[in-house]
């Protein structure tokens, strides 16, 4: 017959291929699908595969001008979620040719761009992505990575310490720089701009950059250690963001910062390239992540956003604490912490890792634990996160009854005590409080901190 068969047909006839072998070059996705009542899971899974690749709602004449078999996404496996009725994990494979090289933006536009408002689905959540080696290799990744950062800072064998300067809005640049200096002088490695400190009427970015640079040079001279302050370069336009990064480089500071979700992946990748070319470290804040990842059955899991960041580029990223004020289940958090740091991560469903991921030597990202943590948490944090991490105590430094510098001293003493105890073979989980108590005998600053935050 001439022409083609017009009309609407079930997605599952074309896009559900349970016997399909996935290719090493495919991007694999695991979706948590909650179909509308009466919609079979195969149809729901196939609908996701279709709408995020080559499909549209009806057969079109131009389908005949391309090879659907070559380009279509395929739903290749569906399994029910234990303990949930009418919830399924649908696995979808996308041919690599559907994606632009080196563009996290395009990857997300394709995979999660359109399908989340789909009528046949009550809810949809992207749980994990397997990025194939061939695609990983089209990204620069983190500007420097864990090892290069340690070499630049000359700090080895322990987690790094940070502190977010509070109150986050309202300080003048001069007083802001003063707070930075006190913290760094006391023994922290880094201080941090809050995510919403950009360039507001009470403190313009240039003034802040200048006073913070002065503070860290002064602290460096006093302590003989390299210091950094995450200068937030996030701005309303990409051009302005790069302008701020250029100014930071001209001041000779070691690190800048970006809010990668509100700033966008395109801006973030540009900044990451600039940072590698100019020797700046890049600290990443995940402001707005909970809008996307908080719901258990809809949106995107943070591990996907973390993987995307490693491709786009960043040297540090906030990743929850496991112990402080923000929620995070321990095993799941450790799962994506490994995805950020390690070169090769095995599939492990108990840790939320749906696919084995090989990063083919893309540099690692340091996870940043931050939010409601203080000196009593130090043993647990040292044990959970290990050496390759940044521990950030905002209120846990600035809330010290004697001020910022003593607060910084308390944190540094607690950290060094925990690292030493661990290296001597002591068990941080069971002896943690004991270790902190012993250390506080020799440090009045730590003793005062222990008193304020005792549980």
Swiss-Prot record:
How is the protein altered post-translationally, as described in the entry?
Answer: The disulfide bond which can form in the large chain dimeric partners within the hexadecamer appears to be associated with oxidative stress and protein turnover.
Report the active site residues. 166 (proton acceptor), 285 (proton acceptor)
| Annotated positions of the N6-carboxylysine modification | 192
* Key words of the record: Calvin cycle, Carbon dioxide fixation, Chloroplast, Disulfide bond, Lyase, Magnesium, Metal-binding, Methylation, Monooxygenase, Oxidoreductase, Photorespiration, Photosynthesis, Plastid
The prosthetic group or cofactor this protein requires is: Mg(2+)
Give the E.C. number(s).
4.1.1.39
Do you know which Pfam families this protein is assigned to?
Answer: RuBisCO_large, RuBisCO_large_N
**Binding annotation for substrate:** 114, 164, 168, 286, 318, 370
Give the matching CDD domains: RuBisCO_large_I
Binding note for cofactor: Binds 1 Mg(2+) ion per subunit.
Q: PTM N6,N6,N6-trimethyllysine: list the residues.
A: 5
Q: What are the BP-aspect GO terms? A: photorespiration; reductive pentose-phosphate cycle
- Residues that bind Mg(2+): 192, 194-195
* Miscellaneous notes: The basic functional RuBisCO is composed of a large chain homodimer in a 'head-to-tail' conformation. In form I RuBisCO this homodimer is arranged in a barrel-like tetramer with the small subunits forming a tetrameric 'cap' on each end of the 'barrel'.
**Record text on subunit structure and interactions:** Heterohexadecamer of 8 large chains and 8 small chains; disulfide-linked. The disulfide link is formed within the large subunit homodimers.
> What name is this protein filed under?
Ribulose bisphosphate carboxylase large chain
Tell me the organism: Lupinus microcarpus
Q: What is the lineage of its organism?
A: Eukaryota, Viridiplantae, Streptophyta, Embryophyta, Tracheophyta
């Amino acid at each position: 017959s001439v022409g083609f068969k017009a009309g609407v047909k079930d997605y599952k006839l074309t896009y559900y291929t349970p016997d399909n072998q996935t290719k090493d070059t495919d991007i694999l996705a695991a979706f948590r699908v909650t179909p509308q009542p009466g919609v079979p899971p195969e149809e729901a899974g196939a609908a996701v595969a279709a709408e995020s690749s080559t499909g549209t709602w009806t057969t079109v004449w131009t389908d005949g001008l391309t090879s659907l078999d070559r380009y279509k996404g395929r739903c290749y496996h569906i399994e029910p979620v234990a303990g949930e009725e009418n919830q399924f994990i649908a696995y979808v494979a996308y041919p690599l040719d559907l994606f632009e090289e080196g563009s996290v933006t395009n990857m997300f536009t394709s995979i999660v761009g359109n399908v989340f408002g789909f009528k046949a689905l009550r809810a949809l959540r992207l749980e994990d992505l397997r990025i194939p080696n061939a695609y990983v290799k089209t990204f620069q990744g983190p500007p420097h990575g864990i090892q290069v950062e340690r070499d630049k800072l000359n700090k080895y064998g322990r987690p790094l310490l940070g502190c977010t300067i509070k109150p986050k809005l309202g300080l003048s640049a001069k007083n802001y720089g003063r707070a930075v200096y006190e913290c760094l002088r006391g023994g922290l490695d880094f201080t941090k701009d809050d995510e919403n400190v950009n360039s507001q009427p009470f403190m313009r970015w240039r003034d802040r950059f200048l006073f913070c640079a002065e503070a860290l040079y002064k602290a460096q001279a006093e302590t003989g250690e390299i210091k950094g302050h995450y200068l937030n370069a996030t701005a309303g336009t990409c051009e302005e963001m790069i302008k701020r990064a250029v100014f930071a480089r001209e001041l000779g500071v070691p690190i800048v910062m970006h809010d990668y979700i509100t700033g966008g992946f395109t801006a973030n990748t540009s900044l990451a390239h600039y940072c590698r070319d100019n020797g700046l470290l890049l600290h990443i804040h995940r402001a707005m992540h909970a809008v996307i990842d908080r719901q258990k059955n809809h949106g995107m899991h943070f591990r996907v956003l973390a993987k995307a960041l490693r491709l786009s580029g960043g040297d540090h990223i906030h990743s929850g604490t496991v112990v402080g004020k923000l929620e995070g289940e321990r095993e799941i958090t450790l799962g994506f912490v490994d995805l950020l740091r390690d070169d090769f991560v095995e599939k492990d469903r108990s840790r939320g890792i749906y696919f084995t991921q090989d990063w083919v030597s893309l540099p690692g990202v340091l996870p940043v634990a931050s939010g409601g943590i203080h000196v009593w948490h130090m043993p647990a944090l040292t044990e959970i996160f290990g050496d390759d991490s940044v521990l950030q105590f905002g209120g846990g430094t600035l809330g010290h009854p004697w001020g910022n510098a003593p607060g910084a001293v308390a944190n540094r003493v607690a950290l060094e005590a925990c690292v030493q105890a661990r290296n001597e073979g002591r068990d941080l989980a069971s002896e943690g409080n004991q270790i902190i108590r012993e250390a506080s005998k020799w440090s009045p600053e730590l003793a005062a901190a222990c008193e304020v935050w005792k549980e």
